[in-house]
A protein has these predicted regions:
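Walker A/P-loop
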Residues: 38-59
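Generic hydrophobic, aliphatic-rich segments that mediate packing or membrane embedding
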Residues: 28, 53-59, 82-89
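N-terminal pre-P-loop "Q-motif" helix
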Residues: 19-36
């Protein structure tokens, strides 16, 4: 990336959880922003550890903050470990932001992970049946 391109991306760094971007993150942020601004989607396939979560969040936050009117970002994950990465990333990001610019985060986990009943850890079909009867 040239110096010109790097300075063009400097604004996106403000929404990263770390002071410096990992290789490939700035390009991903740029591609995500472009897709979001055009009302489209961006599908990223990259190796583990490149910082896809942080880059996607940085782009989404930038797009939300520069949009007309308030915007909400929904970040869905299929695993609790991925969920934790999103929460931790936002916490690290907020540690770098002034109070008036912090990102508000509401996180939710699956119903069986919030249930205090002993049957919550049973098989999903059994849990659904017992939970519906317990209501």
């Amino acid at each position: 990336m040239s110096g010109e391109e790097s300075s063009a991306f400097s604004e996106e760094i403000r929404y990263l959880a770390h002071e410096e971007a990992r290789p490939g993150q700035l390009e991903m942020i740029h591609d995500c922003l472009k897709a979001l601004q055009q009302g489209g989607h961006h599908l990223a396939a990259a190796p583990t550890g490149i910082g896809k979560t942080a880059a996607a969040l940085a782009a989404a936050i930038d797009a939300a903050r520069t949009a007309n009117g308030p915007r909400t970002i929904f970040f869905l994950t299929s695993r609790q470990s991925q969920h934790k990465i999103v929460v931790d990333t936002v916490r690290r990001l907020n540690a770098r932001r002034p109070p008036q610019e912090k990102v508000r985060l509401v996180d939710m986990v699956g119903q069986s992970n919030m249930c205090v009943q002993p049957f919550a850890k049973e098989s999903p079909p059994l849990f659904s049946l017992l939970c519906s009867q317990a209501r």
